[in-house]
Regions:
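N-terminal loops that bind phosphate or other acidic moieties
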Residues: 1-162
């Protein structure tokens, strides 16, 4: 079970990691304009959330941690990558409304909602961008959350000659 504190600390940790790798992410920035600022803009955007999350009490809910993150990121968004990041968290936050804690299924749904909102908000979504990274991450999370396929058939396949 994911508590508000766990989500809060995870987002803070992610913000710190992005800040530490800002220059590397800047180097990856080649589309739509190779201006080398994606890491900087994303770092500033999630950095705004980090600042507010540090002031959030440890007994916060996942709803509150997600809402504070989404709101701070929207207000602190810098550049296209910052705006898209804030949209991802906006959808993520909406999916966690009313939740004190979250399980894996809740987080998968939140990721999916974030991706859906970000794709809808971009006029011409282009694959090979941060949208793709978010979508694939969401799909992989869903795959890990799905029940494993059964090793036994409940009915014999028509191709089986047993």
């Amino acid at each position: 079970m994911i508590t508000g504190l766990t989500l809060k600390n995870s987002i803070i940790s992610g913000a710190n990691n992005l800040s530490n790798r800002r220059a590397k992410v800047d180097e990856l920035n080649v589309f739509p304009v190779p201006d080398g600022d994606t890491g900087t803009n994303m770092g500033m955007t999630i950095g705004a959330a980090r600042t507010e999350l540090l002031n959030l009490p440890d007994d916060c809910t996942v709803e509150k941690a997600a809402q504070v993150t989404a709101s701070a990121m929207l207000r602190g968004a810098r550049g296209n990558s910052g705006v898209i990041s804030s949209l991802l968290f906006r959808g993520f936050s909406k999916a966690l409304q009313g939740k004190k804690t979250a399980d894996a299924k809740d987080l998968v749904q939140a990721l999916e909602k974030g991706v859906e909102g970000a794709y809808k908000a971009v006029m011409k979504p282009t694959e090979g961008t941060m949208l793709t990274v978010a979508r694939v991450a969401s799909e992989e999370a869903a795959a890990w959350c799905a029940p494993p396929p059964s090793a036994r058939w409940t009915t014999r396949p028509s191709s089986c000659r047993c």
